[in-house]
From Swiss-Prot:
Protein name according to UniProt: Probable gluconokinase
Cross-referenced InterPro entries: P-loop_NTPase, Shikimate/glucono_kinase, Therm_gnt_kin
Family annotation (CDD domains): GntK (cd02021)
Annotated keywords: ATP-binding, Kinase, Nucleotide-binding, Transferase
Single annotated GO MF: ATP binding
Pfam families noted in UniProt: SKI
Origin organism lineage: Eukaryota, Metazoa, Chordata, Craniata, Vertebrata
Coiled coil stretches, renumbered: none
Length: 185
């Protein structure tokens, strides 16, 4: 992958997005963003109460993330983003902006492609049981394990024509990182 580019590490909560994304950014020397850090307080409160987010909750968040990625890519900085990006529409917003969503009052909803073909989606996938078990062990996160089923219900795994790879979270962290680095060659 020629720089600048974007590596989107996606999957349901508990799939290891943040851990894998941070490791890859470190190995590649790229900037790392964890999308969870950019949720509005309202979204955090809603999830903390066990209420799943809907498209209206997610779209402004995704448009803001697109703007951050666009700024970095435009300045020549390659980026790793850890983000659930459960639906194709969400991944499209991250890559191309929000022109296919209802208009907003600000200018960030304009379509501005990030990196053309330099947008690789890494889908970290695993069984509900495995990931639910991980969530039960996790402490200090605003996303309760009870919301996992709602994420699996709306998940649209990447498929052609998206530029993607699926990686099982049954593998160890070194194996996952090696598979992604190989895909970037």
């Amino acid at each position: 992958m020629e720089t600048p580019g974007v590596l989107l590490v996606m999957g349901v909560s508990g799939s290891g997005k943040s851990t894998v994304g941070a490791l890859l950014a470190n190995k590649l020397g790229w900037k790392f963003y964890d999308a969870d850090d950019y949720h509005s307080e309202e979204n955090r409160i809603k999830m903390g109460k066990g209420v799943p987010l809907n498209d209206q909750d997610r779209i402004p968040w995704l448009c803001s993330l697109h703007d951050i990625l666009l700024r970095d890519v435009a300045s020549g900085q390659s980026v790793v983003l850890a983000c659930s990006a459960l639906k194709k529409m969400y991944r499209d917003i991250l890559n191309r902006g929000g022109s296919d969503v209802p208009p907003r009052s600000d200018e960030s909803a304009k379509e501005e492609p990030l990196a053309g073909g330099k947008f690789l989606v890494v889908h970290l996938c695993g069984s509900f049981e495995l990931i639910y078990g991980r969530l039960l062990q996790r402490r200090g996160h605003f996303m309760p394990p009870e919301l996992l089923q709602s994420q699996f219900s709306i998940l649209e795994p990447p498929s052609a024509p998206e530029n993607f790879i699926h990686i099982s979270v049954d593998k160890g962290l070194p194996e996952i990182a090696a598979a992604v680095l190989e895909a970037l060659k």
